[in-house]
Each structure stands twice: as structure tokens, then as C-alpha cells.
Curated annotation (Swiss-Prot):
UniProt entry keywords in alphabetical sequence: Cell membrane, Membrane, Transmembrane, Transmembrane helix, Transport
InterPro entries assigned: ABC-4/HrtB_transporter, ABC3_permease_C, MacB_PCD
Membrane topology qualifier: Multi-pass membrane protein
Organism expressing this protein natively: Mycobacterium tuberculosis (strain ATCC 25618 / H37Rv)
Name of the featured protein: Uncharacterized ABC transporter permease Rv2563
Length: 349
């Protein structure tokens, strides 16, 4: 019966090719959406990792060192720096801002850190900013060293380029000195949003808490939660569409082969063997569609304006998910086969 199912696939190859390509495109879009969600996290992880700190010290109750921070005066910085387990401490600040590009404005995320860190990323070209009027920018902005950049109400000189530094769905990052960020966002007040530390403090002054890198990444991703949830819903709907495509093909195949199935039953072929052949047909279609989907996802990902990083686990899981979809999609056809009367084999044309 399995051989008969594969022969049927061969004879109906045109229809099945259309189903495989259609389902493969759905699988590809699902992989791209998975990569889009993963890309949000990868961006945040790259940003946090580039700062080169082991942990962040924030005010007690703050949700994180970036978007969930509670700004505070840096008067306690020396005390934190002397805490047991702290190798180095630096005042850090973060604020959303805009830059001017011709007649239009573009959102950026501004970070402030000392020139030599911790907290200042390495640049691929130029150097780190050393004065409040200098800035290092993401290479995604397409700016050159020596250009003037209007950030908010200030005009800064670009002295460094940070490779592919983005967060919050491809929003470019820019890096100033801590004093430069304070002038940009806090009217020059000695206010910071966190203290970046090397090492791990065993005791902190009252009113402060430690945030590890994983929680810092989550803080940077928090504004994207609604978008991630929406993308997840769309991905689930696409899985359902894939199952419907495969199911419709298998069901039509079952309807067209009713006489064949009746003959099989009449000559004593077990129903379970017939069902296995039909299920195999659905699984073959789904698995071939998974291969097509994996290839298409690699071609589609670069076309998206945001970072798309499809995790290896998604490619590994796709064949298993495709198999489950194939089996579920074959249910309608299986029920039709079970109901076939063997007497149909002896009926007229």
C-alpha cells in the first residue's frame, strides 16, 4: 500500500508540486516570522554584549538599566565602585532621541558611557567619543567619520562607527560620553540610569539592586512585547493554513481514489494499510514543502527591512512540525476511506 501511495504521488505530481510550493511558501513565511522575533532578541543581546559589562546596578524597583530605568544622581558611584566583588564601575545613561536626515527625522537610541568603558562598545572605524560634542554611531546610519550629526537640539561630530549596532526593531544606536548624554537628555544634570560594573558585587548600598545581562536584554525588548505577540498569532495562523493546504490535496486525492480503495478492501487489504498509505502521501507532501520552505526563508530573509535571524532550532523543528501537520491534514481523507463500502468495487462506471 505504501508503494501504491507513492505511485499515486507520481501520477498526480503536477497538483502535488503546486501544493508543495504553496505550503513551502507558508512554511518560509513562518520561518521568517520566527527569525523576526528572534532578531529582536539578537539585536538586544548584541547591544548589551557590546557594552562589555558583567552586570548593571540600578535603583531598587527599577525594571532594568535601559528603558525601565529610574534615573538617579551619580553621587553613589564611588560607593558602588568600592563594593566587594566590583572590579570596575562606570556611570551609564540611556535615552531615546531623534536625528535629522535632510528634512526628515529618524529615531535612535542614545547611550552614554565613559570613553574607555565599561559601557562603551568597540568601534570598527575611528575612535570612541571623548568629549560631550562627539558621538560614535551605528554603521546602519550610513554616516562617515567627521560628519556633523544633529541629535535632538545638539549638533555632534561623528568620531567612530560601531558595526551593525541596532535595537528595538532595527533602530540605530548612537554612543556618547556620559556627560554628552546628560547634556542631551538631562539638561546637563549629573543623572544616570545605571552603573555598569565588571565583576559581581556581593553587597550594594541601600536602595540599589543588581540587574544581570539577561534581564538587561529583556528590558531592552520590553517595548516589542505586543509586536512579538502579534507576530506569534500570525505564525500560528500560517501553520493552520499549511495544514489546510495539505489536507485539501489529500482529501481530493482520497475522493478521486474511492474506487481504488474499495478494490483494496474487497481483496482483503487491511484498512490500516490503506490509511497508512494515505497518511504517507500527506507526510511526503509536508516534508517536501518543509525543504522548499527552508530554502525560500533564506532567500526572503534579506528582503526584510528588519533583522531576521532564523534560529537553527527552527530549521531542526520544521520537519517534525511538517510531519505532524501532514498527519493532521490527512484526517479528513482517512475518515472518508474508513467509510468506503467494498461493494463499490463491483459497481458500474
Amino acid at each position: 500500500m505504501l508503494f501504491a501511495a507513492l505511485r499515486d504521488v507520481q501520477w498526480r505530481k503536477r497538483r502535488l508540486v503546486i501544493a508543495i510550493v504553496s505550503t513551502g511558501l507558508v512554511f518560509a513565511m513562518t520561518l521568517v516570522l520566527t527569525g523576526l522575533v528572534n532578531g529582536f532578541r539578537v539585536e538586544a543581546e548584541r547591544t548589551v554584549d557590546s557594552m562589555g559589562v558583567d552586570a548593571f546596578v540600578v535603583k531598587a524597583g527599577a525594571a532594568g538599566p535601559f528603558l525601565g530605568s529610574t534615573p538617579f544622581a551619580q553621587i553613589d558611584l564611588p560607593q558602588v565602585a568600592r563594593a566587594p566583588g566590583v572590579l570596575a564601575a562606570a556611570p551609564l545613561a540611556t535615552a531615546p532621541s531623534t536625528i535629522r536626515q535632510g528634512t526628515s527625522a529618524r529615531n535612535v537610541t542614545a547611550f552614554g558611557a565613559p570613553e574607555h568603558g565599561p559601557g562603551m562598545p568597540r568601534v570598527s572605524d575611528g575612535r570612541a567619543p571623548s568629549t560631550p560634542d562627539e558621538v560614535a554611531v551605528s554603521s546602519t546610519l550610513g554616516r562617515n567619520l567627521g560628519d556633523d550629526l544633529q541629535v535632538g537640539a545638539r549638533t555632534l561630530r561623528i568620531v567612530g562607527i560601531v558595526p551593525e549596532s541596532t535595537a528595538l526593531a532595527k533602530i540605530p544606536n548612537i554612543f556618547l560620553t556620559t556627560e554628552g548624554l546628560q547634556q542631551l537628555a538631562y539638561n546637563g544634570q549629573p543623572t544616570i540610569s545605571s552603573i555598569g560594573i565588571d565583576g559581581m558585587p556581593r553587597q550594594l548600598p541601600d536602595g540599589y539592586q543588581t540587574v544581570n545581562r539577561a534581564d538587561a536584554v529583556s528590558d531592552l525588548m520590553r517595548p516589542l512585547k505586543v509586536a512579538v505577540d502579534a507576530i506569534t498569532v500570525v505564525a500560528v495562523l500560517l501553520w493552520i493554513v499549511a495544514a489546510l493546504i495539505v489536507g485539501s490535496v489529500v482529501y481530493l486525492s482520497a475522493l478521486e481514489r474511492l474506487r481504488d480503495f474499495a478494490v483494496f478492501k474487497a481483496i482483503g487489504v487491511p484498512t490500516r494499510s490503506i490509511l497508512a498509505g494515505l497518511a504517507l502521501q500527506a507526510v511526503v507532501v509536508a516534508l517536501l514543502a518543509a525543504v522548499v520552505g527552508g530554502i525560500l526563508s533564506l532567500l526572503l530573509a534579506p528582503l526584510f527591512p528588519m533583522t531576521v535571524v532564523v534560529p537553527l532550532s527552527a530549521f531542526v523543528a520544521l520537519p517534525a512540525i511538517a510531519t505532524v501537520i501532514g498527519l493532521l491534514a490527512s484526517v479528513a481523507g482517512l475518515r472518508r476511506v474508513v467509510a468506503i463500502d467494498p461493494a463499490l468495487a463491483f459497481g458500474g462506471p
